[in-house]
Amino acid sequence: MSARVALDPLEAGVFGWFQWPPGRGRANAGVIVDPDGITLVDTLMTPEQWAPFAGEVEEIGLPVRRTVLTSSSVEFAGGTGRFKLAAIYGSAQASLHLDQPPNLESWQALYPEQAEGFAEVETRPVSHVVTSDVQLTPSTAVLTTGGQMSENLVALVEGAHMLFAGAMCSFGVTPLCWQGDPAGWADELDRLAELAPIIVPGHGPIGGVEDLRDQQAYLRACVAARGDPSTLPPGPWDLWADREHDVINVERAEMLAHGDSGIPPSMLRLAGLA
């Protein structure tokens, strides 16, 4: 179970929602306040997570106008149905995924602690497909990127020197790259490193460029492993949660190196599909 959390003020009009202990199934979210209303960055997963989050967001006293999805994964998009009047901004890939019927059995296999809550999860489709960088509000720019999936989004609050990286960053938690490109993800982190010194990841505590570089080194080590996770060298990741993701990340990198963009068999096993 996730520990009780609350909105964490990060800067004037900017809040984070950090789930503890960090790990798969316990993603973060962001709240950015503009004069016309609120922009959310991701919406958490099941009612146990998004109900208290929504309650605290409502206490701000402004309408939720916009939701930016950094990924289509249910960890980030599961609460979209709770914010029924918000416009949903996502990538074309996220839009495609969210138009498909949910796979409850896989969700329950991947996130067993939240298995009972998925019966109440109704994701909303993307209403605004983002294909290029855009200044969404006076405070927030939405930038296109990719790596965790082929197409991800991040939200930059330049005035707060803060990047809501969502699914693109995972600090203290092993990233999971079964539908993206570990090598391309590592390269794209170079661009994100230049955007802001403060980074709010999709999993784990708030961090900075040093944490991003640790993640980058891990992803490059997965590529260099050439399909054998036992050859991963020691590093900061030795202390990370969810090291069962290693085999998936290494397998995905090796499959892509040989022109195979299919789902890694190790991911199918984790999701209860093999």
Language-model features, listed with the residues they occupy:
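Metallo-beta-lactamase
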Residues: 38, 45-47, 96-144, 146-222
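Active-site metal-binding motif and surrounding structural segment of the metallo-beta-lactamase
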Residues: 47-90, 195-196
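Accessory terminal helices/loops
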Residues: 194-198, 206-274
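Hydrophobic/aromatic beta-strand patches that form the interior of the parallel beta-sheet core
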Residues: 15, 68, 89, 128, ...
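Short, acidic/turn-prone active-site loops that include or flank metal/cofactor-
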Residues: 92-96, 169
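Short catalytic-loop micro-motif centered on adjacent basic/acidic residues
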Residues: 16, 39-42, 65-68, 141-142
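Conserved beta-strand hairpin/beta-sheet module of binuclear metal-dependent hydrolase folds
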Residues: 4-55, 154-167
